[in-house]
């Protein structure tokens, strides 16, 4: 299911796969024509939420580049929501036209697979986070969460990580963690640089 402006719609299908390491990935693929019809009736500024249930290692929402472009033209906001957090961004921040140029001018937007995912960080990134915490003198109260946006066509992939507007990432505070002990959230770049 996909939620548009707070109303649940049947416009997505979920699939869970397990890799050789036993890590599960749950992917919700949005039905382009169904979502297009729903958005046409909503006007501009709609919020499209892709809720992903379960405790998968990776939770991802997938749309076509054409759907992202359509959402962009309608000033829509995309939200991927999981048990560990949410990723909220205006569709325009994916900048699908620039991505398309990087993938090749002959690539149709409908052939570009846009994936917004929330996952546990890799072992190497977890080590980077732990080192950054040690160097910065802060304590990790909640497990780190990795947020990524990729756009792919065939074997080519473009990572989207720079934005011109505010992009919201939230982390759920697990049971047993005292929220009064949490001062701030910190972004840790792959090189170990931290930002508040």
Regions inferred by a protein language model and the residue ranges of each:
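Ser/Thr/Gly/Pro-rich low-complexity, disordered linker/stalk segments of secreted
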Residues: 1-26
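Proteolytic processing hotspots in large secreted/extracellular or virion-associated proteins
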Residues: 20-184, 189
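Surface-exposed loop/edge segments in extracytoplasmic proteins
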Residues: 191-196
């Amino acid at each position: 299911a996909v939620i548009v402006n707070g109303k649940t719609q049947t416009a997505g299908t979920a699939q869970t796969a397990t890799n050789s390491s036993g890590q599960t990935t749950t992917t919700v693929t949005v039905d382009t024509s169904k979502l297009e019809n729903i958005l046409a009736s909503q006007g501009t500024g709609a919020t499209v939420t892709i809720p992903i249930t379960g405790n998968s290692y990776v939770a991802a929402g997938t749309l076509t580049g054409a759907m992202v472009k359509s959402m962009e033209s309608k000033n829509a906001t995309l939200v991927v929501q999981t048990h560990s957090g949410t990723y909220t961004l205006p569709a325009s921040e994916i900048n699908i036209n620039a991505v398309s140029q990087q993938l090749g001018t002959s690539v149709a937007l409908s052939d570009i697979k846009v994936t917004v995912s929330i996952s546990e960080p890799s072992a190497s990134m977890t080590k980077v986070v732990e080192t950054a915490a040690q160097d910065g003198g802060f304590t990790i109260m909640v497990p780190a969460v990795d947020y990524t946006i990729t756009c792919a066509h065939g074997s080519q992939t473009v990572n989207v990580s720079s934005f011109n507007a505010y992009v919201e990432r939230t982390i759920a505070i697990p049971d047993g963690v005292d929220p009064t002990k949490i001062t701030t959230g910190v972004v840790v770049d792959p090189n170990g640089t931290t930002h508040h």
